[in-house]
């Protein structure tokens, strides 16, 4: 019986240590084990793609790494970021002319990387500056809301708020001239309030996923 309990002891210790790890850390370790290279996240199979799914997941990785001191996770994110952007700050296959708000979201990790490595590598600041330029010329509805994409003219999507506005707000906080901040923050708030007004369905009390100002798309 004593030998039996001695055999179980290492297993019990391992289970105990695992239980002490936050689920966020355990999830990250699982993702990194299954995808040693972040280009394999979201089923990309090693294909580089500037997309919100990978960018959003890696932003969560960075947040957890900062909370729980995991330098290997930071390096994992940085490897992907450096693969996606040249030293000049040019992003792989990114085209501003597509005016896709989904392509604003992944740039958020470059704020964090600039804070950590900006003295060594200027690309992180250059990426955020370039993505910010898209916001300046992003097509809008008559009421001032961002189109979701150039290929979806006049359409405002609820998920577009999250794709663009956290980046827009963070960039404003960090870099906008003080005299411009109030108007920029007001623009951010307007995206939410106007979007909510135009997507709200009084019949159900819910918000539709999207609104088409031109009324040409049947589903929104």
At which residue positions do the language-model features occur?
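Bacterial Sec-dependent N-terminal signal peptides
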Residues: 1-20
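Residue-level preference for long, well-ordered alpha-helices that form the structural scaffold
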Residues: 20, 53, 73, 120, ...
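Long, well-ordered core segments of solenoidal/helical folds
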Residues: 21-40, 75-93, 126-145, 185-208
């Amino acid at each position: 019986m004593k030998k039996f309990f001695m055999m179980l002891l290492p297993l019990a210790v391992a289970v105990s240590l695992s239980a002490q790890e936050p689920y966020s850390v355990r999830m990250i370790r699982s993702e990194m084990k299954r995808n040693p290279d972040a280009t394999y996240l979201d089923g990309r199979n090693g294909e580089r793609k500037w997309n919100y799914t990978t960018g959003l997941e890696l932003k969560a990785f960075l947040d957890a790494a900062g909370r729980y001191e995991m330098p290997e996770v930071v390096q994992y994110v940085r490897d992907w970021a450096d693969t996606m952007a040249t030293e000049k700050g040019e992003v792989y296959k990114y085209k501003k002319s597509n005016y896709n708000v989904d392509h604003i979201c992944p740039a958020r990790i470059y704020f964090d990387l600039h804070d950590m490595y900006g003295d060594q590598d200027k690309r992180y600041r250059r990426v955020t500056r370039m993505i910010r330029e898209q916001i300046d010329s992003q097509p809008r509805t008559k009421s001032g809301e961002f189109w979701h994409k150039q290929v979806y003219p006049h359409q405002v999507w609820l998920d577009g708020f999250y794709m663009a506005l956290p980046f827009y707000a963070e960039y404003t906080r960090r870099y906008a001239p003080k005299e411009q901040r109030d108007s920029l923050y007001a623009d951010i708030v307007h995206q939410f309030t106007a979007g909510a007004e135009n997507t709200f369905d009084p019949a159900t009390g819910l918000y539709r996923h999207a609104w088409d100002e031109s009324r040409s798309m049947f589903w929104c």
